[in-house]
Structure formats: C-alpha cells, structure tokens
C-alpha cells in the first residue's frame, strides 16, 4: 500500500455501509481520518454499523440527516447504490464537497496498476476471463470490484508487480476523480439503470468516466461494433485498441478464417473455445486484447479458452430432466442480456422472465422470441412482458407470483428436447436481494422437479 497522508485528521463521511462502505471506513480510519459513518438502516438491524462503532467510529443510522454536513466534512465516500438525487448528496454537491466511491480510494492507495472493465453486459464474464488469462500467463492478477473482494481491501495488499482487475459499474464510475486504469475496456452500451441516471446519455457519460484520466501511456479497449461506445471513446486520451466480431481490425482484435486474431496474429481457433454463445466472442476478444497488451502468450490464452465454461448465473447450465435442459441466466438484468441469451439457443425455449420495473417496455425482445414456445412471467414487469409476448404472437403466456411457481409452470409447458431458460431481462430487487439469490432459488426449484 502506498503511503497516503491526504486523509490524515480530515473529517470524512462514509455514506452507506454494506461491504464497500465497511471496507472504506476501515481503510480511512487506518489512514488517520476522522470517520463518520451514516446508513439508512436502524442501528439495531445493522451488524456492520455496530462493528464500526466498536472500532471507535462515529456511526449515525436510521436516515441521512443533513446536519452531518455541518461537521467540516472534507470528503464523502458513497455506496454506489445511493442515488445522487438523495438530499444529503444534493446538499454535499451544493457545498462543493467531493463525492467519490470506494474504487477511487482503492486506486489512490494501490501500488499495483488497474485494469478496469465496464459495459452494460458481459462485465463479469470478461473480468473473469481476463483474470484467468493473466493468471495463466503468470502476470499475478488480483480480482476486485463487483466480483471478488472489495477493491480497497485488495488494493491494500496489491504489490507493484501485480495487476488489479476490476469490474466497474456506472454507479461506481460516477464517483471517480483521479482513477486512471492502465487498461480500460468498454464493452457495450444499452439503455439501462434509467431510474438512477435518467437518460441513456447520462448513463453512457458515467461509463465513459473510465477513460477520463487516461494518458497516451494507457490503453482503451473499445467495441468497434457499438456506435455509442465508439462515440464515447472520444473521452479517452489513451491508445485505442478496437475489437470487432463483424469486421477485420488490423491493429486490434477480430475474427477471420474461423479464428481470433490480435494485431494480425492468429491467437486461437474458434473451435477451441468452449464458452457458448455468439455474444461471448465479444467478451473473449476484449479479454484477449487486455491479456495480449500485458504480454500474455497465445498458448496461455488458448489454455484458458479451452476450459473456461462461464460464470455462475450467466447462461449457467443447471441440469437435464427428461431431456429438457435448464439454464440459469439470472444475471440478465436488462433486455440486451436476455436477447443474447435467447440468441444462444436454436432449440424450442420456455422463457422465465420478469422483475423490477425500471420504466422500460419490452418490445425490443419480440424479434428474439422466434424460438420461444412459451413464456412464464413474474415480478413487477409481468404485465409488460405479457404485452410483448402477445404482440409476438406466442400461444402460451402465463403470469405467476413466485419464481418457484414459474419453474413448475415452465416445466409443464415443455416437451422433449426443449430448453427451459431463466433470463429475467430485469433487476431482481422487487422480490430478491440480489440476482445471485434469484438464481439460487431458481436452481433449488429446478432440483425439486427431480
């Protein structure tokens, strides 16, 4: 960990606890700050808050009183999930108090360089692929961010010869000031999180923060097939490395002659890749580009791609019952992810979908229903999904209250050779704490059928 003195004796407000807030508060105390921790949940229900209080921190729970900002606050470190429209953040901004997220702290203390990966879809898969390729290539990666350990915990122990590989959301990237990844990858942009950002434009600009401090000594890995990403790459001063699944890229990554190429050199045959789905070729090209930029050999990259079958909750094969294959794609929290999941199968498919209503309609899914024989909807968006299914002319459309019911109904509507796919196209927070919990409940419900 770097020697950092900028926080000593400063009053710093950590807003929202959870894992990242707990880690940030603990780190700041270690760095000599006077830490004030604030969380909306009452102290009696807040185990982490009680632990921080026991460490000697000033902990205020049960709301976000504006009076906290009268304590000569030098910096606010916010939980990514707390929107900037929250009154305490609006007031902090008016007072010109800097507002950052925990990943910014991680960067400031880390001796190791960062690789940052963002995009609407494919972040987790690309992050895991990158980690595995760097590990196989003996580049000493450590994984942090939305997957793995909280970034500022990892950064405390990361050494100069290591690489911190981070999956970064728009929520996290809105709160960076100095964050400068050695390599920044922007995979794609799809209309999402409008309840948080308001517009696709603002959402895209938040993502583009991954580029804002890069220099000509850094690299920006960019999806040449995504017009929005290409436009936002103008914010990068780094060396641009493009990847594409549709056209040849001489100075980047592409597919030609049924193989993956990087800067004109064949790296791996498509036939050696075990990860299913056409969309995953984009993720592989991005990860491969990062690995090659960091000096990983073709042999190491190929070894990973011959064994890497995917990440949990992302087109995860669950089991086969009476020749019906079940897949858990609970991480599909928006339409684009579900479109890609549906495109991965040619068999008749029974789709389970639904979740938190963020204001979207689902007509964009209609062209992808060509192999969908039945849909079972649940959650807040069930009526909207039913409307889209009716427009698509599906014969079998059902709505149920719970995911357990949805699994039973989906199996009842299936026949020999079908795929039964959970790909919700929505966030999980209307009925579940996380998409992981939703996926686990789906898997449990499937096993009850056996």
Swiss-Prot record:
Keywords, in A-Z order: ATP-binding, Cell cycle, Cell division, Cell shape, Cell wall biogenesis/degradation, Cytoplasm, Ligase, Nucleotide-binding, Peptidoglycan synthesis
Pathway: Cell wall biogenesis; peptidoglycan biosynthesis
SUPFAM superfamilies, per the entry: MurCD N-terminal domain, MurD-like peptide ligases, catalytic domain, MurD-like peptide ligases, peptide-binding domain
Residues that bind ATP: 119-125
Disulfide pattern: none
Listed GO biological process terms: cell division; cell wall organization; peptidoglycan biosynthetic process; regulation of cell shape
Pfam family membership, one: Mur_ligase_C
UniProt catalytic activity: UDP-N-acetyl-alpha-D-muramoyl-L-alanine + D-glutamate + ATP = UDP-N-acetyl-alpha-D-muramoyl-L-alanyl-D-glutamate + ADP + phosphate + H(+)
EC number, as in UniProt: 6.3.2.9
Gene Ontology CC terms, in alphabetical order: cytoplasm
GO molecular function annotations of the record: ATP binding; UDP-N-acetylmuramoylalanine-D-glutamate ligase activity
InterPro entries: Mur-like_cat_sf (IPR036565), Mur_ligase_C (IPR004101), Mur_ligase_C_dom_sf (IPR036615), Mur_ligase_cen (IPR013221), MurD (IPR005762)
Gene3D superfamilies to which the protein is assigned, alphabetical: Mur ligase, C-terminal domain, Mur-like, catalytic domain, NAD(P)-binding Rossmann-like Domain
Class of the enzyme per the UniProt entry, highest EC level: ligase
Predominant location: cytoplasm
Family, per entry: Belongs to the MurCDEF family.
HAMAP family: MurD
Job description of the protein: Cell wall formation. Catalyzes the addition of glutamate to the nucleotide precursor UDP-N-acetylmuramoyl-L-alanine (UMA).
Name assigned to this protein: UDP-N-acetylmuramoylalanine--D-glutamate ligase
């Amino acid at each position: 960990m770097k020697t950092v003195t900028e926080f000593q004796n400063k009053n710093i407000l950590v807003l929202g606890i959870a894992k990242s807030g707990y880690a940030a508060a603990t780190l700041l105390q270690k760095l000599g700050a006077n830490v004030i921790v604030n969380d909306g949940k009452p102290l009696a229900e807040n185990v982490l808050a009680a632990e921080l209080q026991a460490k000697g921190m000033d902990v205020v729970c049960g709301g976000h009183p504006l009076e906290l900002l009268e304590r000569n606050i030098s910096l606010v470190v916010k939980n990514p999930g707390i929107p900037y429209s929250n009154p305490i953040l609006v007031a902090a901004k008016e007072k010109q108090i800097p507002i950052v997220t925990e990943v910014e702290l991680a960067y400031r203390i880390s001796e190791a360089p960062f690789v940052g990966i963002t995009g609407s879809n494919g972040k987790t898969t690309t992050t895991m692929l990158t980690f595995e390729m760097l590990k196989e290539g003996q580049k000493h990666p450590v994984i942090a961010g939305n997957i793995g350990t909280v970034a500022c915990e990892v950064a405390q122990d990361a050494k100069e010869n290591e690489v911190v590989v981070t999956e970064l959301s728009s929520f996290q990237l809105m709160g960076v000031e100095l964050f400068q990844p050695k390599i920044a990858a922007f995979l794609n942009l799809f209309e999402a999180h409008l309840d948080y950002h308001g517009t696709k434009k603002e959402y895209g600009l938040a993502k583009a923060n991954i580029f804002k401090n890069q220099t000509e000594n850094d690299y920006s890995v960019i999806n040449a097939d995504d017009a929005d990403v290409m436009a936002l790459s103008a914010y990068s001063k780094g060396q641009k490395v493009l990847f594409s699944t549709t056209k040849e890229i001489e100075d980047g990554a592409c597919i030609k002659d049924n193989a993956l190429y990087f800067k004109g050199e064949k790296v791996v045959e498509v036939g050696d890749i075990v990860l299913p789905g056409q969309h995953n070729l984009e993720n592989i090209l991005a990860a491969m580009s990062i690995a090659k930029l960091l000096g990983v050999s073709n042999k190491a990259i190929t070894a990973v791609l011959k064994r890497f079958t995917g990440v949990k909750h992302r087109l995860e094969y669950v089991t086969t019952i009476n020749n019906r294959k079940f897949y858990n794609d609970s991480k599909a929290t928006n339409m684009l992810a579900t479109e890609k999941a549906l495109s991965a199968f040619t068999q008749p498919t029974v789709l389970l979908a639904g979740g938190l209503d963020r204001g979207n309609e689902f007509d964009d899914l209609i062209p992808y229903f060509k192999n969908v024989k039945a849909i079972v909807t649940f959650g807040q968006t069930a009526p909207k999904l039913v409307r889209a299914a009716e427009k698509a002319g599906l014969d079998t459309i059902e709505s149920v209250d719970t995911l357990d019911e949805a699994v039973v109904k989906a199996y009842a509507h299936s026949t020999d050779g079908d795929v039964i796919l959970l790909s919700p196209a929505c966030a999980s927070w209307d009925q579940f704490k996380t998409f992981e919990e939703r996926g686990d409940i789906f898997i449990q419900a499937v096993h009850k059928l056996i």
